[in-house]
Amino acid sequence: FSGRKLDTTKWDYQIGTGSQYGLNGWGNEEAQYYTPKNVFVKDGYLVIEAKKEEKEGKSYTSGRVRTMKQDGSPLFTTTYGRIEASMSLPEGNGVWPAFWMLSADESYGTWPLSGEIDIMESRGRLPNRVYNAIHYGQPWPMQKYTSSMYKFPAGQKTTGFHEYAVEWEPGVIRWFVDGNMYYETSSWWTMANDAVEPFEYPAPYDKPFYILLNLAIGGTYDEYRLPNDYD
């Protein structure tokens, strides 16, 4: 990343609580309000900073960016390939950083029918491990997911810089940390509510996806934990 601000020809902000999509708390009962002020570039790195401050009914502010404009038009999408980032993650209760992908056009329907690829997620209170997932199946609440965990070698933590990557090919998705593949799957399906059979495999992972980076606070992912005052 260059300069001091987000390059909005490549990335754009998502703002608010998710209420504009009918998902207050971004569908996970999260405790933050996303603002552009919590995202900046420093020394060549993109920084997302969470703060304890009240904003429009939320107790924290933080940041979320994606390779899609606020109006929903794409800035960057990909179908297949290797997607990677070198990241240093925060430690502490209630912090939930994520590096992930969503369908650019929801070809198969709204979440989770068109899929979600979680390249990396972390629970800040467990700084020696990260997680991945794919989401698919039928409409909520009958959705499915497949997930795995990577545990760092002794002496390493998520607070150091590590490379997180996914390799996405027709019919297979693989996850890597620091070049080490730790999980792969070819098992998924997706089906509309009124359908008799699923969409043709490898749906939904055969359409363009865009990239997201965010730092959430609280919510369902780690049982509603919130940061301690000293975190």
Region annotations inferred by a language model:
Residues 2-231:
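GH16 jelly-roll
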